[in-house]
Amino acid sequence: MTNIRKTHPLMKIVNNAFIDLPAPSNISSWWNFGSLLGICLILQILTGLFLAMHYTADTATAFSSVTHICRDVNYGWIIRYMHANGASMFFICLFMHVGRGLYYGSYTFLETWNVGVILLFATMATAFMGYVLPWGQMSFWGATVITNLLSAIPYIGTDLVEWIWGGFSVHKATLTRFFAFHFILPFIIAALAMVHLLFLHETGSNNPTGISSDMDKIPFHPYYTIKDILGALLLILTLMLLVLFVPDLLGDPDNYTPANPLNTPPHIKPEWYFLFAYAILLSIPNKLGGVLALVLSVLILVLMPLLHMSKQRSMMFRPISQCLFWILVADLLTLTWIGGQPVEHPYIIIGQLASIMYFTLILVLMPVASTIENNLLKW
């Protein structure tokens, strides 16, 4: 009798995706982040579901309901902090996953890469709306400032902002719709993740060398299932260290003050994972220019396949490109730091230089380096 996992219509899908899937024999720990993102998503949906059972999406009671969850609900505090810090872990894994894709040239799988970029935008939208829900000072002012950026769009901008707000300011209607979107988007993300996997399994995984590994494949189970379990344990360990020892490390103290439209916090800033884009936004004095740069800072990922000039796929054997890649990483860390600082000298000029550096590295220096490396190969 044939094994049920190979014949049953549902089990067959699982089998072909996670058990008998042919995988390259040389993929490193950088290939663990896909499964870690899946775990993060499941964790966020589960903790979010339990939080939604006690949360009220109303300006009068939202802040109190979060306090109630932390104080009165059984293990509510741990669910709340797992959800908040789970978002940070999600973005750490996302940045590592995207960075891996850039380094090893995974963007040459066009469909997989483009679905991935859509996933990144969807996750950023979800995280932004989630940050508004506790209705603290930074929730309210963050929502006001970020949504207000859309007013920079010519002609339709102001109407668009008022349409999103459901009125003339961020108020009850805004909070209710943000909660609705924050609840539905993770399920859309889950569906997109399946499409992402579907496209990936059409081509098979990339590997550190960037060379076809068709002649050297191994089954996903047990080799990579056990490797993914180790990654998952390390992820959960890191998350629980954050939750149990320093739950507010990555949060903002201003969010423990209830939202007050009459009192603006001294430094309005988003969560840490948006600071790089926020720094790019602030580095341009013009409002529309800043918004365009903000969107382009992430949308530039779509251009990566077009900017790939090298004859080799991966950066494994390209030392000049490697140097530029790590300079880009350092530049992004600099932007993240600047995004959290007040808008004053010397932070303004550092932010402007880091922003110029960011776009120059991706659009000019990396393609030029690839061309130089191609010529060096001829020698």
From Swiss-Prot:
Keywords: Electron transport, Heme, Iron, Membrane, Metal-binding, Mitochondrion, Mitochondrion inner membrane, Respiratory chain, Transmembrane, Transmembrane helix, Transport, Ubiquinone. It is a multi-pass membrane protein. A ubiquinone binds at residue 201. GO terms for molecular function: metal ion binding; ubiquinol-cytochrome-c reductase activity. GO terms for cellular component: mitochondrial inner membrane; respiratory chain complex III. CDD domains: cytochrome_b_C, Cytochrome_b_N. Heme b b566 binds at residues 97, 196. Binds 2 heme b groups non-covalently. Its cofactor is heme b. The chain crosses the membrane at residues 33-53, 77-98, 113-133, 178-198, 226-246, 288-308, 320-340, 347-367. It is found in: Mitochondrion inner membrane. Its main location: mitochondrion. Heme b b562 binds at residues 83, 182. SUPFAM superfamilies: a domain/subunit of cytochrome bc1 complex (Ubiquinol-cytochrome c reductase), Transmembrane di-heme cytochromes. It holds the Pfam family Cytochrom_B_C. GO terms for biological process: mitochondrial electron transport, ubiquinol to cytochrome c. Belongs to the cytochrome b family. Heme 1 (or BL or b562) is low-potential and absorbs at about 562 nm, and heme 2 (or BH or b566) is high-potential and absorbs at about 566 nm. The cytochrome bc1 complex contains 11 subunits: 3 respiratory subunits (MT-CYB, CYC1 and UQCRFS1), 2 core proteins (UQCRC1 and UQCRC2) and 6 low-molecular weight proteins (UQCRH/QCR6, UQCRB/QCR7, UQCRQ/QCR8, UQCR10/QCR9, UQCR11/QCR10 and a cleavage product of UQCRFS1). This cytochrome bc1 complex then forms a dimer. Component of the ubiquinol-cytochrome c reductase complex (complex III or cytochrome b-c1 complex) that is part of the mitochondrial respiratory chain. The b-c1 complex mediates electron transfer from ubiquinol to cytochrome c. Contributes to the generation of a proton gradient across the mitochondrial membrane that is then used for ATP synthesis. This is Cytochrome b. It comes from Raphicerus sharpei. The gene is MT-CYB.
